[in-house]
């Protein structure tokens, strides 16, 4: 099984002991797992505006074997993802957007920029529940694959020792391109959200620009020194990703820490963290939250008891609903025409 060009232009194949490859499928979407047994190849895949189902793959194409979510999609709309490419510094970058429900070219709309984790992950034109909820509530939802993302080769993916540099600039250039493409986006009502590495980037962004009206930082990293010493990912990860340890180059770690720039932040920020997150310890959120409060920036910290780094994906259902409601309420307060109006998740 291999990926070609991007993580969402999937080519999957069987490789024989003689090196012969048999192409099974090459379509836009995701394949989260693939297995071969008794002459069949099956996997969990997502296609278009539908969530993941079980598929079988063969040289003749693919066949969906399950219809687990048809009742949901019979009563809930999901919009297709707009896709395009743009250039920055001679590098082609992938860009995506969901247009707000009932989009009217004569109106202006708020927007939310979403930043994926990893950074060795990738977005694509597939169903994403949280983004569809935001779209249904009247937002442009903008997302891209900056340098550091998966699917484009090792050179593109390698931002080690340079977190917050090319990746940050790519995201800012992406937003500029999206604003030029859709003048219906109200530049004064753009928010930014991200989790894990995406949370790191949100923390970094608020210390480097004031162009966002609000921010949501989830399961984030704020201090590479404390991250080195507390994360269950192991100390070798930060040493590799940042190119330093606390003992051979403390300055290098601090320079790549959003906390170092928190005194510059002006953006109202919501922090969401699992209380039992051992990948990015809850102290990462607490440090950034405390720094913003100390410097007089409006902020809110939500710690979810019993939840870990996987809150948004496999957390307790009631907690996942609460998380999404917290995000939507924060965005609505700062981005909607009626400040403070609570927004729920009952539409999708």
Could you describe each region identified by the protein language model?
Residues 1-20:
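Single conserved hydrophobic/aromatic residue that forms the stacking wall/gate
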Residues 12, 49-56:
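Structural motif
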Residues 68-188, 193-195, 229-236:
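Cap/lid segment of the alpha/beta-hydrolase catalytic domain
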Residues 143-348:
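Active-site-proximal cap/loop segments of hydrolase catalytic domains
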Residues 17-32, 57-82, 169:
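Multi-bladed beta-propeller domains
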């Amino acid at each position: 099984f291999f990926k070609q060009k991007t993580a969402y232009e999937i080519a999957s194949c069987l490789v024989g002991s003689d090196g012969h490859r048999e192409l099974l499928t090459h379509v836009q979407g995701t394949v989260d797992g693939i297995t071969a047994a008794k002459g069949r190849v099956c996997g969990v895949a997502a296609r278009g505006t539908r969530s993941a189902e079980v598929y079988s793959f063969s040289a003749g194409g693919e066949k969906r074997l399950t219809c687990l979510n048809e009742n949901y999609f019979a009563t809930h709309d999901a919009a297709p993802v707009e896709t395009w490419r743009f250039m920055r510094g001679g590098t082609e970058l992938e860009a995506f957007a969901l247009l707000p429900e009932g989009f009217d070219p004569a109106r202006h709309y708020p927007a939310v920029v979403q930043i994926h984790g990893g950074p060795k992950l990738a977005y694509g034109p597939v169903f994403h529940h949280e983004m569809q909820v935001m779209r249904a509530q009247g937002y442009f939802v903008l997302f891209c694959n900056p340098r550091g993302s998966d699917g484009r080769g090792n050179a593109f993916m390698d931002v080690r020792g340079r977190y917050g540099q090319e990746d940050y600039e790519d995201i800012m250039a992406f937003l500029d391109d999206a604003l030029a493409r859709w003048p219906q986006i109200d530049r004064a009502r753009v928010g930014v959200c991200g989790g894990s590495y995406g949370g790191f980037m949100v923390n970094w962004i608020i210390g480097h620009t004031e162009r966002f009206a609000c921010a949501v930082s989830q399961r984030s990293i704020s201090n590479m020194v404390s991250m080195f010493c507390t994360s269950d990912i192991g100390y070798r990860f930060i040493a590799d990703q940042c190119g330093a340890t606390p003992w051979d180059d403390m300055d290098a770690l601090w320079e790549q820490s959003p906390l170092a720039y928190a005194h510059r932040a002006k953006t109202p920020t919501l922090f969401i963290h699992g209380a039992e997150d051992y990948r990015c310890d809850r102290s990462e959120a607490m440090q950034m939250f405390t720094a913003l409060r100390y410097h007089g920036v409006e902020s809110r910290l939500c710690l979810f008891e019993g939840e870990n780094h996987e809150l948004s994906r496999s957390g307790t259902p009631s907690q996942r609903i609460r998380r999404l409601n917290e995000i939507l309420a924060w965005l609505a307060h700062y981005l909607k025409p009626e400040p403070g109006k609570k927004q729920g998740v009952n539409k999708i």
